[in-house]
């Protein structure tokens, strides 16, 4: 039984099946299936090498881990902050592995091809942050998917949390608005206010 100490007060045993924290033991639930959802800060899918060289793969600015209990049907969403510092697999400009380096978690996606390699690198980094928890599947979307997903559910109702009239006159602070089409992307991309 190999034991490794990851951070102060935390020990992991049995390849992540058992985590000991502050003297309490937490056993991994085998009925949980986990899916990492990533929102990537690119306008289009990086399908050609020229685009990738010019613009890069992008960063996974939004990371959510869905934990699905296949026995009970319960789904829990865990927001994984993009700015967590993690040891990320890095690659040089030729794609050659150059070791794990301490980087913001969102950069794990950037060390890839904007497709499966990027996603798998992000999955690896998130798993490491969460003490080796297995991540069974992943899905990434880019910015162009926001309006499509929004419209697929008939729009999203929001109370505007900051004055965004400079980008859309209907987005007045405090207004209740149903975001439709590209308006949803405009809203989530706006950085003119800090909701915290």
Model-derived regions, located:
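Non-catalytic, solvent-exposed segments at the cell envelope interface
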Residues: 1-196
């Amino acid at each position: 039984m190999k034991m490794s100490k990851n951070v102060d007060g935390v020990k992991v045993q049995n390849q992540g099946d058992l985590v000991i924290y502050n003297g309490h033991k937490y056993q991994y639930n085998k009925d949980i299936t986990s899916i990492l959802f990533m929102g990537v800060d690119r306008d289009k899918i990086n399908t050609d090498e020229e685009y990738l060289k010019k613009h890069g793969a992008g960063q996974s600015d939004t990371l959510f881990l869905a934990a699905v209990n296949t026995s009970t049907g319960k789904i829990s969403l865990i927001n994984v902050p993009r700015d967590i510092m993690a040891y990320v697999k890095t690659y040089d400009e030729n794609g050659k592995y150059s070791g794990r380096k301490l980087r913001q978690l969102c950069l794990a996606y950037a060390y890839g091809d904007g497709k499966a390699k990027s996603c798998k690198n992000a999955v690896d980094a998130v798993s490491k942050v969460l003490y080796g928890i297995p991540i069974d599947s992943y899905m990434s979307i880019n910015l162009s998917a926001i309006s499509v997903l929004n419209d697929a559910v008939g729009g999203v109702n929001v109370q505007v949390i900051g004055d965004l009239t400079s980008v859309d006159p209907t987005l007045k602070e405090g207004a209740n608005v149903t975001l439709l089409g590209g308006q949803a992307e405009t809203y989530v991309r706006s950085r003119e206010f800090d909701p915290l």
